Amino acid sequence: MTARVKICGLTRPQDVEAAVACGADAIGLVFYAPSPRAVDLEQARILAAKVPAFVSATGLFVNPERDYVEAVLDAVPLDLLQFHGDESPEFCQSFGRRWIKAVRVREPGQIEQAFADYHQASGLLVDAWDPNRYGGTGQSFNWSLIPESRPLPLILAGGLSSDNVARAIEQVRPWAVDVSGGVEESKGKKDATKLSQFFKEVHRVCKTD
């Protein structure tokens, strides 16, 4: 099998370059001011300019105002939108762009319902539930809550690192994995060695599958 990799929460050009060199399929830019990994429009333009052809630049939003999303789209060449809050399907669909929806998993049946509600998405990202934070928790969740029947590509996030990503891929068999804190030296600053180790584990398990 093949598992694609998205590196999220990038804030430095050299980290984009390192992620791409390791084989990242997508990089994530956070447009959510409370996050320690948030970038402004000028930072985002610089980072997006480092993203080559065939690697997706993804913009992450949490309960944004419509005007803000439109301002980002006007300023930054994003390939994909990621909505990580409580956005409605209608809101997500209204920008005329490809998008994915994040679900913070805490109970059985929640993922199945999200597949139905957000059926126009290009994928569903499943992450750990935290009552105080929208993602970026560094925590995993009970993967047995993920159904085998998946009408959309499933992206696995939540507490992934080189220590557990191989097991995650073997157990969940996701379309893609999404990592941020598991490849950092500090919030927003990626660690080249951790990036390399993460990709080695992904490639190892996919090759042997």
From Swiss-Prot:
It catalyses: N-(5-phospho-beta-D-ribosyl)anthranilate = 1-(2-carboxyphenylamino)-1-deoxy-D-ribulose 5-phosphate. GO terms for biological process: L-tryptophan biosynthetic process. Its EC number is 5.3.1.24. Pfam families: PRAI. One of its GO terms (molecular function) is phosphoribosylanthranilate isomerase activity. Coiled coil: none annotated. It comes from the Bacteria. Pathway: Amino-acid biosynthesis; L-tryptophan biosynthesis; L-tryptophan from chorismate: step 3/5. Keywords: Amino-acid biosynthesis, Aromatic amino acid biosynthesis, Isomerase, Tryptophan biosynthesis. It is an enzyme of class 5 (isomerase). Belongs to the TrpF family. HAMAP family: PRAI. This is N-(5'-phosphoribosyl)anthranilate isomerase. The gene is trpF.
